[in-house]
């Protein structure tokens, strides 16, 4: 008899844990879609998300006398945050603008990047120790790691900083982007 209750309790803990991992992952994905202005995808995910949320929460609230259920809920939430972040990295929606300042003035770097398909705007900049090459590069987030690796290969001491543009009009990218 004790073994039945132990198995049942363990099953409940696993269900609560899994439900909360799924819930928080869906929450993260919905937020990404919302921030990327993909309202219909965000709305669809939110409907699934709320069903999963209510199921998980009701399992915990119906069994508040079992502290292990609450702990499973909290642990599932934490794992869900990590899982959601991994999903966000894989989705890599949107674009980034990368600003690069080279250690030395190397005029061939922009053309090397252009040959790889990147849109590059460049100019001469002046730092404390003389002329530098300044570049502004717009790329998809899926290409971000490759771009960084290419830049580091071309100039291991380059200063690189990036940010996500909210909107952009005209230029190199507009021809190839479908919205």
UniProtKB/Swiss-Prot annotation:
TM helices/strands, residue ranges: 9-29, 41-61, 67-87
Query: Where does it mainly reside?
Result: membrane
Q: What are the entry keywords?
A: Cell membrane, Membrane, Transmembrane, Transmembrane helix
One Gene Ontology cellular component annotation held by this UniProt entry? plasma membrane
Q: Which domain of life is it from?
A: Bacteria
What membrane topology is given? Multi-pass membrane protein
- Where does the record say this protein resides? Cell membrane
NCBIfam families on file? PRK04164.1-5
Question: According to its UniProt record, which protein family does this protein belong to?
Answer: Belongs to the UPF0316 family.
What's this protein's name?
UPF0316 protein BH0621
Q: Organism source for this protein? A: Halalkalibacterium halodurans (strain ATCC BAA-125 / DSM 18197 / FERM 7344 / JCM 9153 / C-125)
């Amino acid at each position: 008899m004790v073994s039945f209750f132990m198995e049942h309790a363990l099953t409940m803990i696993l269900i609560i844990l899994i439900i909360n991992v799924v819930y928080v992952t869906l929450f993260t994905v919905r937020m990404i879609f919302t921030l990327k202005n993909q309202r219909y995808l965000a709305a669809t995910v939110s409907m699934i998300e709320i069903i999963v949320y209510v199921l998980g929460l009701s399992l915990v609230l119906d069994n508040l006398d079992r502290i292990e259920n609450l702990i499973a809920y909290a642990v599932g939430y934490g794992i869900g945050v990590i899982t959601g972040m991994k999903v966000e990295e894989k989705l890599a929606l949107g674009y980034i603008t990368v600003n690069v300042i080279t250690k030395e003035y190397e005029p061939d770097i922009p053309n090397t990047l252009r040959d790889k398909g990147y849109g590059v705007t460049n100019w001469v900049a002046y730092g404390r120790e003389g002329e530098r090459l300044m570049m502004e590069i717009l790329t998809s987030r899926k290409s971000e790691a490759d771009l960084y690796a290419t830049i580091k290969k071309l100039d291991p001491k380059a200063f690189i900083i990036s940010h996500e543009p909210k909107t952009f009009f005209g230029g190199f990218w507009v021809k190839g982007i479908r919205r």
